[in-house]
Amino acid sequence: MDNAPPKGMRDFAPEKMIEREQTIGIVKSIFRKYGFKPLGTPAVETLDVLNKKCGDEIAGQIFKIADSELGLRFDMTVPLARAVAASNFARPFKRYVIGPVWRREEPQKGRLREFVQADIDIVGCAGMKAEAELIACAVECIRALGFDKPRVKINNRKIMDAVFESLKIPKENEFAVYRALDKLEKIGKKEVEKELDAKGVEKPKIGAIFSLLEGKGENDAKVAVVETIAPEGAAEMRSLLSLLEKYGVDVEVDLALVRGLDYYTGPVFEIQLGGGIGSVAGGGRYDKLLSMYGQPDSAVGISLGIERLMALLEEKKKAGEEKKTYTEVYVAAVKEEFFDDALKIAQKLRSEGIACETDLLGRNLRKQFEYANSSGIPWAAIVGEKERNEKKVTLRNFVSGEEKLVTISDAVQLILAKK
């Protein structure tokens, strides 16, 4: 019997889960700081809901539940649209959600079949203020995780829509062209050109598209190039650039950025950190999606890829810095007869907010220390005959090797001072 998890999915040992929970905790605290509220939706949705606007490629990646009309969610945006349509939340509705999604695609670096997304969305705000706040919040999250140079790229689907219209690319081909262009960084220009050719886009039109996408210069110059052909998209771009400057966020206009999902209708954006792992965050405006679920409204969101961030954090991490446990103190009884004393001490420490463990197996002191060391617990509070009589503990720091007899209250102060 093979006990490995399914292809493209992983188990996480305690030390890895601690890292993940710490990362998610940082992200969640910043989401809340910006006023986003939690919203929970099921992991399973009806296929009718999931297929509304996902496109053929994503539709083929949905994990379907046999003999039912249900499937696992492939992102957090479609469930949001359904939930908002079923509710009457005050506007603007600012929501966050952090949880797993599933896509049946070929696993590779930074891309799994089960992965955690951390999403924030704003429903009911049509202006660029929502986009600016989302991007600023995401950038703050990434900086708080120790990445001080996030690369933010923005574009606007209205610009590309206008370009396609000027080139007389049929409406029914637009989404296929978007999906091909979205693969530019992954498969390169030549392969994208082949895909566009296969979709029936004539070579002169392909050349015109790439002439625009490969435009050089500062942000103002790039926007100026499309101002005549796409005035609305260009105006939104200038407004967003101005707002992001007020947030202190540096951005790059990238006319090649399209994002592959079919539901985007306006600004789109990505955040990259290098490391050969693609974008760590991305999103955009999807004003038409909610109307498909019966409640027309404006909406925009951004998603942080926790798996990709964790992979980059793993690369950054120095040897020996891995935190294996939340436990701060191992309360060790010299003999089994002192277990009750150890239990009382542990409860006292816990009441002070200090995470503790006691021995549940009746092991001798040496084996208790071996367990504490291997678990990465930094402190031991030892209780025996002397400690019981003096109402104290022997506090040992496993890192420094220092050991002293102290009162419980002094032990609390020493441990908290090192937190």
Q: Residue spans of the language-model regions?
A:
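Phosphate-rich ligand and nucleic-acid binding surfaces
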Residues: 165-170, 203
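Auxiliary tRNA-acceptor-end handling modules of aminoacyl-tRNA synthetases
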Residues: 1-17, 66
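Short, surface-exposed recognition loops or helix-turn segments adjacent to catalytic cores
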Residues: 149-158, 177-178, 252-258
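Positively charged, Gly/Ser-enriched RNA/tRNA-binding surfaces
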Residues: 16-34, 45-46, 75-89, 95-147, ...
